[in-house]
Amino acid sequence: MSKVIGIDLGTTNSCVAVYERGESKVIPNKEGKNTTPSVVAFTDKGEVLVGDSAKRQAVTNPEKTIYSIKRIMGLMINEDAAKEAKTRLPYHITERNGACAIEIAGKIYTPQEISAKVLMKLKEDAEAFLGESVVDAVITVPAYFNDAQRKATKEAGTIAGLNVLRIINEPTSAALAYGLDKKDSEKIVVYDLGGGTFDVTVLETGDNVVEVLATGGNAFLGGDDFDNKLIDFLANEFKDETGIDLKNDVMALQRLKEAAENAKKELSSANETEINLPFITADASGPKHLVKKLTRAKFEGMIDSLVAETITKINEVVSDAGLKKDEIKEVVMVGGSTRVPLVQEEVKKTFNKDLNKSVNPDEVVAIGAAIQGAVIKGDVKDVLLLDVTPLSLGIETLGGVMTKIIEKGTTIPTKKEQVFSTAEDNQSAVTINVLQGEREFSRDNKSLGNFNLEGIPPAPRGMPQIEVTFDIDANGILTVSAKDKATGKAQEIKITGSSGLSEEEINNMVKDAELHKEEDKKRKEAVDVRNAADSLAHQVEKSLSELGEKVATADKENIQKALDDLRETLKNQNASKEEIESKMKALSEVSHKLAENMYKKDEPNTANDKKKKDDDVIDAEVE
């Protein structure tokens, strides 16, 4: 087996590493640098430039220079993040089959194709360095990338001619690089703030085990957003002074982006910098220049709300791990944006301890990916990497309830099954609506996709057994299947997620679950009691019909009255849980004789057979 390379495919920069002779090391590119800009450019001569050469000509070729492509990877064109990208990026974002794509000189490219060009360069640089062909790779993604984004990343690798052995989470990869040589068990936090994404992960490392305890983040927050705050400030100031909106000029916008990025870097070591952009534009009165002094304090005022979001997420994730901050031994800083002083100050203040800067924030993720590649190949033995799923997964059941099948924080890969049944008599098909989130009701969670299982033989409600299986592989990609146990008919869907989770959706999922915990509980209890009442009424009606004349007239009248009372109460959508339970109790009492007659009618072993058959059936029904 040839060498396995580890790749950190970043929003701003990418890095490749390899494990050989007992250590993981970064592979420099042909230009002699350890990182390669994730930039692709198409020239008028038909050339395709990748990396530094593409970045250098961005100002003169803004509409054909593609950067930050990771921000639209796996997104649909109608998503908020895609709409935001269209206003920020100078190149033409369009759509292909509803998904984001790029149009350059009349040709459509998918984000996978653009990313593949970056991966191809990394592959070629690795082959030149190692002196041999490279095919196998481990590629990292943000922990909060959804299934569509993970799948798109894997597809980019395939397009680049790579056999992607594994997709692993960036903070987990960093922890693998940091914690491999740790003999004593310790709990650490990896704070990963890159160019376009943010993750925070709590892990336990030691004795060659790296276990994720909790993870969280925002797939649309990073250094690009810091730059955008500064771009907005500069453009608005210039407009106030001259009346000219630089955002309408793609070349000026590209110059602003470069200036903002450089100012951000300079303010990491200096208290003040000057942004000087001569001949940024012109009007009837002549050329215009943009000259602006910027202090670190001013810049920090622009980005403090973004940094505060990351601190809030830290608190949530540490809490999810069941830990207190003083139990965290180390805080490892990963990603180029962690060089911003305000970020370091706020994280340090949060944990009240010095930050661990022993790892290179631009290289550690690729180094960890190379280690994981060596583990898969067998060069590194006895190393165990235990990652988790960040949100619960389940399906919609009767009453619009979300029934969880895989709980948040479950170690992956994992496979779990539950058996459900039908909600109506003679129901020939069920719709499986796959959900992600922490709320009790389907409408409050994220729908990842749905599919139908058809051809179920006619049978009374509750009789068919539909086995639903959730299977998450080591790449975090979900496959859901449903099988009718009687006929063996099956249907499955690989969840590719038509859209990513927006910042608002992700933050609100867990927060809303906590805020509405009591409200959700009451609503779920009300749905449960209605389902139970409906089931009882159905069973009593069925028994009355089967027994016919065996039931005394007086008993039948009493049962029918109680049954009608319950049905009437259920028609009232405002009926309380207590009212329904009262009517259920009345029906249960008067139908006691009916139950006795049914019992006498059954053969002795029937009840035991029924119980055995139903042991694995969950008390929930699929609509």
From Swiss-Prot:
Residues 595-615 have a biased composition (Basic and acidic residues). It comes from the Bacteria. GO terms for molecular function: ATP binding; ATP-dependent protein folding chaperone; unfolded protein binding. Keywords: ATP-binding, Chaperone, Nucleotide-binding, Phosphoprotein, Stress response. InterPro entries: ATPase_NBD, Chaperone_DnaK, Heat_shock_70_CS, HSP70_C_sf, HSP70_peptide-bd_sf, Hsp_70_fam. The modification Phosphothreonine is found at T197. NCBIfam families: PRK00290.1 (NF001413), PRK05183.1 (NF003520), prok_dnaK (TIGR02350). This is Chaperone protein DnaK. It comes from Campylobacter jejuni subsp. doylei (strain ATCC BAA-1458 / RM4099 / 269.97).
